[in-house]
């Protein structure tokens, strides 16, 4: 079940409040205006957008809004309910045969679980089922990585463009040393671009990338539990034994101890 992840906007609002309070407590409300500079903001955001446009093809950039939306949604998968589902399927398969699960499998809404069960019902062996399902997981992980990479690179570019703006401001300041009226505005550009770049990186792009990565790990975890459940049903494992296995396996700490299959660039697979 998908629900609104309120912690994402709460984090943004909380970070903004902390910055604003820090500024006001040091210089008052009137001093807050000193931290607003359109030129500095334009240098950072404009340069950041240019760098991102150069780095990614249009097809990846078009997906960015939908990927960003995932940071505001949390998927609530109840592992206990999932275990109960597999226990029920296993019990039914042992009593009436694996083929009797066909109707139940086709009614399942989760496409990953549905596909795995249909493979088992169609008579595919354990090794093939595991290979197909692991390939599905790897493909999903790669899609998520590509979507997340836009925000990861933006988090890298933002501080760099902040530094570029700082250099621009310093050059302008040194060029106008004879004009005292220009020292303040140019110094503001030099310092505020660094501030804006750091804020965009550490309060927007990097946290979003981190949240997207955590969501990917959670989804992989759920799918790994599904794979083990499907294999258990396919092999005719005793429902109680399958339940005991999945209860242990469904602990994230235990799952992280399992050897992971790592796919290299050449296509070979080895355990890490």
From Swiss-Prot:
PROSITE patterns: MOTA. It is a multi-pass membrane protein. InterPro entries: Flag_MotA_CS, MotA-like, MotA_ExbB_proton_chnl. Residues 209-272 are cytoplasmic. NCBIfam families: PRK06926.1. Keywords: Cell membrane, Membrane, Transmembrane, Transmembrane helix, Transport. The keyword tRNA processing does not apply. Pfam families: MotA_ExbB. The chain crosses the membrane at residues 9-29, 38-58, 154-174, 188-208. GO terms for biological process: bacterial-type flagellum-dependent swarming motility; chemotaxis. This is Uncharacterized protein YtxD. May be involved in some transport function. It is found in: Cell membrane. Belongs to the MotA family. GO terms for cellular component: plasma membrane. Signal peptide: none annotated.
